[in-house]
């Protein structure tokens, strides 16, 4: 049995394949998922698992240097936005490397998701609760 924190086989394999600047989209239950990127569907029911839980799991193994969010989250879902920013800032401190946060319009976010290695669907139902994680390097 695997010893690490991240036990989900498809997620673990995805993280192992990531190179510097490769991207993973972590999305809510409603984001349209394009053909092309690998689809890892973790959604069980509304709210389960939450985006925060999926992000926590991924951050146990993935070095992240940049995160992209839809700018609409700041106005439409401010509490969720602040929780994500807090989580990312805490992780940046723990990994000893900064994480840049960038914003774009939701339509541009959806277009950008097409270049992700994979799209990981959570059960999150908060509007605009979607992230693109850009991989950093561990050295």
UniProtKB/Swiss-Prot annotation:
Keyword Cytoplasm: yes
Localization of this protein: Cytoplasm
GO annotation terms (biological process): D-ribose catabolic process
Assigned EC number: 5.4.99.62
Primary enzyme class: isomerase
UniProt catalytic activity: beta-D-ribopyranose = beta-D-ribofuranose
Highest taxon listed in the record's lineage: Bacteria
Entry keyword set: Carbohydrate metabolism, Cytoplasm, Isomerase
InterPro entries: D-ribose_pyranase (IPR023064), RbsD-like_sf (IPR023750), RbsD_FucU (IPR007721)
Pathway field: Carbohydrate metabolism; D-ribose degradation; D-ribose 5-phosphate from beta-D-ribopyranose: step 1/2
Residues at the active site: 20
Cytoplasm as UniProt keyword: yes
Residues binding substrate, per UniProt: 28, 106, 128-130
SUPFAM superfamilies referenced in this protein's UniProt entry, alphabetically: RbsD-like
GO terms for MF: D-ribose pyranase activity; intramolecular lyase activity; monosaccharide binding
GO CC annotation terms, alphabetical: cytosol
Family: Belongs to the RbsD / FucU family. RbsD subfamily.
Function: Catalyzes the interconversion of beta-pyran and beta-furan forms of D-ribose.
Subunit structure: Homodecamer.
HAMAP family: D_rib_pyranase
Protein name: D-ribose pyranase
Lineage, broadest ranks: Bacteria, Pseudomonadati, Pseudomonadota, Gammaproteobacteria, Aeromonadales
